[in-house]
């Protein structure tokens, strides 16, 4: 029995801007994302019976049809008339409900893995089309790397630049639901983020410009709910981080550091402050 293992890296937002609200009630976002080497692992194995089985080592994860990984398998089986079943094992390292795209990355890894397992020979465009049907972050996660994202997550422009940085992550012991953040957005008063300046800094390998322009338009809303997020940011900067920023809708905060020594100082400053602290690198 042949199994396929795919790595599912987490992502952080170097920039997140809200452009406005669409007629359908959703918001147009513009983001810059980059993958980090904190990863889940997705293992898919064939089953003779026509079933979809999901296992996970994380008790917080649903292992039924509510899981995006299940939705991916069901959609691919239906779209490409696959009659055999599949077992999907999720080894979780990325915190859940953390704004780091763990669920989306797992779904993307499942698309890539099933493409191999069932020899579908899907193009990148075809895999992205499946991802769009699952969730807005999934198309980016299929390619991963460093990219500018627009629209519903389907406009992906890979950035020709290399950010080699240490990243310290802090996941507070509470979650923030993205669905509850967006109704509070007032596009007339939120802090805007210059996404073009971030892209230019990355393409020009200008680290100083990058940290100057990084920002997250959702930060003020999430911090108003959970002031602890600001305390984490302040603590990281005080310990020597070049910049500290919330990723996604939170609550996870990350710090960028150019040296491992610097990252160790930041890591040690927050290690006793929160239970979930990670020191990783950009991919």
Curated annotation (Swiss-Prot):
Show the active-site residues. Answer: 11, 137
Which top-rank group of organisms is this from? Answer: Bacteria
**Might you give the EC number(s) for this enzyme?**
2.7.1.148
Q: Key word Plastid present in the record?
A: no
Q: Which SUPFAM superfamilies match?
A: GHMP Kinase, C-terminal domain, Ribosomal protein S5 domain 2-like
Give the top-level enzyme category: transferase
Select a single GO molecular function from the record's annotations and give it: ATP binding
Provide the residue positions that the database annotates as binding ATP: 95-105
Q: Which reaction does it catalyse?
A: 4-CDP-2-C-methyl-D-erythritol + ATP = 4-CDP-2-C-methyl-D-erythritol 2-phosphate + ADP + H(+)
| Record InterPro entries | GHMP_kinase_C_dom, GHMP_kinase_C_sf, GHMP_kinase_N_dom, IspE, Ribosomal_Su5_D2-typ_SF, Ribsml_uS5_D2-typ_fold_subgr
Q: Which residues form the signal peptide?
A: none
Pfam family for this entry, one: GHMP_kinases_N
PANTHER family linked: 4-DIPHOSPHOCYTIDYL-2-C-METHYL-D-ERYTHRITOL KINASE, CHLOROPLASTIC
Q: Which protein family is it in?
A: Belongs to the GHMP kinase family. IspE subfamily.
What does this gene product do? Catalyzes the phosphorylation of the position 2 hydroxy group of 4-diphosphocytidyl-2C-methyl-D-erythritol.
Listed name of the protein: Putative 4-diphosphocytidyl-2-C-methyl-D-erythritol kinase
Q: Which organism was this protein described from?
A: Streptococcus uberis (strain ATCC BAA-854 / 0140J)
């Amino acid at each position: 029995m042949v199994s396929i293992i795919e790595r599912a890296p987490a992502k952080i937002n170097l920039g997140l801007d809200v452009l406005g609200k669409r007629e359908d009630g959703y918001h147009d976002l513009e983001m810059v994302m980059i993958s980090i080497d904190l990863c889940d692992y997705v293992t898919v194995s064939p089953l003779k019976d026509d079933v979809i089985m999901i296992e996970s080592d994380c008790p917080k994860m649903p292992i039924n049809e509510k899981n995006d990984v299940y939705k991916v398998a069901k959609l691919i089986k239906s779209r490409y008339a696959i009659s055999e079943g599949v077992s999907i094992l999720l080894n979780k390292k990325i915190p859940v409900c953390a704004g780091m795209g763990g669920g989306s990355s797992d779904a993307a890894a499942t698309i890539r893995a099933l493409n191999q397992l069932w020899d579908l020979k899907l193009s990148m465009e075809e895999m992205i089309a499946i991802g769009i049907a699952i969730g807005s972050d999934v198309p980016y996660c299929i390619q991963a790397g460093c990219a500018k994202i627009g629209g519903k997550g389907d406009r992906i422009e890979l950035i020709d630049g290399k950010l080699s940085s240490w990243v310290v992550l802090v996941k507070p012991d509470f979650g923030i639901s993205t669905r509850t953040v967006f109704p509070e957005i007032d596009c007339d008063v939120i802090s805007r983020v210059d996404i073009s300046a971030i892209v230019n800094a990355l393409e020009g390998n200008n680290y100083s410009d990058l940290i100057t322009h990084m920002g997250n338009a959702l930060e003020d809303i999430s911090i108003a709910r959970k002031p602890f997020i600001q305390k984490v940011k302040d603590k990281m900067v005080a310990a020597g981080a070049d910049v500290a920023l919330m990723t996604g809708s939170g609550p996870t905060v990350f710090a960028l550091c150019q040296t491992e020594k610097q990252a160790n100082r930041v890591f040690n400053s927050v290690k006793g402050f929160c239970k979930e602290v990670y020191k990783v690198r950009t991919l």
